[in-house]
Design a protein with these regions (language model features):
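A conserved beta-strand-loop-helix scaffold within acyl/acetyltransferase catalytic domains
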Residues: 21-99, 142-172, 176-296
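Residues at the C-termini of beta-strands that transition into short coil/loop
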Residues: 29, 116, 216, 344-347
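Acyl-donor binding region in acyl/amide transferases
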Residues: 71, 85, 92-168, 280-337
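A short, structure-level motif marking secondary-structure boundaries and short turns
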Residues: 111, 185-186, 235, 292-294, ...
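Intrinsically disordered, low-complexity proline-rich regions
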Residues: 5-6, 12-15, 89, 106, ...
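Short secondary-structure junction motifs
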Residues: 135, 207-209, 259, 317, ...
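Active-site/acyl-donor-binding loops of N-acyltransferases
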Residues: 2-22, 155-184, 188, 315-380
Length: 380
């Protein structure tokens, strides 16, 4: 069992006349056996995004961390209830006093989880609990910069005594479906994109050589996982550093009814695969790959159109999300862009935390000066 090397229980009290304003905070060093109220809080959060759910976090903790990386779960609750008011899944490296949210390169969105209608007090108590454990720094990313929780988190960190700095992570392309059919959506794409898709579909499906398959669960699931793994290893992408994570995610999604795994077969061989996750009205385009030997077939384009039709006309999702990055092809398919940001916070009660904040402040102050100097140098 993974474990944090620090106290697992502590009390955090805000003194006042009303005992309901007293908070108790704790750190659970394992995500594998959570009490039902904790599981319920995480799964309620997962309705907004499946990456906030207990299943996602448990798969990440179990199958996507190095041996020296240790997960945990902070919580705070009011003294008069056993129900958690706020939760923070966390991660740190053995021997380090730098803490971060439980997110990795597999994560497209992270959040502190708050169960109270007025989140500010619960978040401040949560971050006070973390700070009093003596961590030098706390990094939270990627966060939804356009959501209320982002500003609430920044404010709560300050109230809890942290020195907090926001930073940009990446762009995120998405599209509100707005009740359209696939035909209406497709007609709204650029004419060049529409013509390309039609031409490539015709070529791929000609003479019955190309076939498209959708796997959601059932007897084809394990064979589909094997096909995904083989295609990914034959693609241009780097090998998976944690080979158990994707099979674990696929099985989790199949169990929950979230999986939309598309396979493109040509002459009986699987040549392209895409993993889409459909949960609570949202379709996330999570992973895609194709066998480079079959690149001229453009099977990935054909498969994207196939899955777009599925999630719009069959699943009736409200939003489609490309998750991470500003790859040029994403704006061919989806219309809107937003940004994901992070927050880097330092604990001024520790020497290392204070030094980190000083360096952060100095770097931010120097950045515009350096930009102006480079601009002048370029004109010289």
């Amino acid at each position: 069992m993974r474990a944090f090397h620090l106290n697992a229980e502590l009390g955090l009290t805000r003194k006042g006349d009303n005992p309901a304003h007293e908070w108790t905070g704790s750190l659970r060093p394992d995500l594998g056996d959570l009490p039902l109220p904790w599981l319920a809080a995480l799964d309620d959060a997962g309705r907004a995004n499946m990456e906030f759910s207990a299943g996602w976090l448990q798969n990440l903790a179990e199958n996507a961390l190095a041996e020296e990386e240790l997960p945990g779960l902070y919580d705070v609750r009011r003294a008069d209830t056993a129900r958690p008011a706020a939760l923070l899944p966390v991660l740190h490296t053995l021997g380090s006093r730098r803490l971060q949210g439980l997110s990795t390169f597999y994560t497209s969105l992270f959040t502190p989880v708050v169960t109270e209608e007025a989140p500010e007090a619960a978040l401040a108590a949560l971050f006070s609990t973390v700070r009093h454990d003596g961590w030098h720094s706390l990094r939270l990313s990627p966060l939804a910069q356009d959501a209320p929780i982002f500003g609430q988190t920044l404010a709560a960190l300050g109230q809890a005594g942290w020195l907090a700095y926001p930073f940009y992570c990446f762009g995120n392309w998405y599209m509100p479906v707005a009740g359209r059919t696939f035909a209406e959506y497709f007609q709204g794409l650029a004419s060049q994109v529409r013509n390309t898709v039609k031409r490539r579909e015709k070529k791929f499906l000609a003479e019955g050589r190309g076939q498209l398959e959708l796997v959601e669960s059932g007897p084809r699931l394990e064979a589909a996982i094997e096909s995904w793994d083989r295609i990914y290893r034959s693609s241009w992408k780097k090998p998976e550093p944690f080979p158990r994570f994707m099979p674990g995610l696929i099985r989790l999604c199949a169990e929950r009814g979230w999986l939309r795994l598309g396979l493109a077969h040509y002459d009986g061989e699987a040549v392209a695969a895409q993993i889409w996750i459909v949960s609570h009205g949202r379709a996330a385009i999570y992973k895609l790959a194709y066998d480079e030997r079959f690149a001229p077939l453009s099977a990935g384009t054909v498969l994207t159109a196939f899955l777009m039709r599925q999630v719009i006309d069959v699943d009736h999702v409200e939003e489609i999300d490309y998750l991470i990055g500003d790859d040029a092809y994403k704006k061919d398919w989806l219309s809107h862009r937003r940004e994901r940001w992070g927050i880097m916070a330092y604990n001024p009660a520790t020497a290392a935390g204070l030094l980190g904040a000083a360096r952060e402040s100095a770097g931010r102050a120097l950045k515009p000066l350096l930009a102006r100097w480079r601009a002048r140098s370029g004109k010289a």
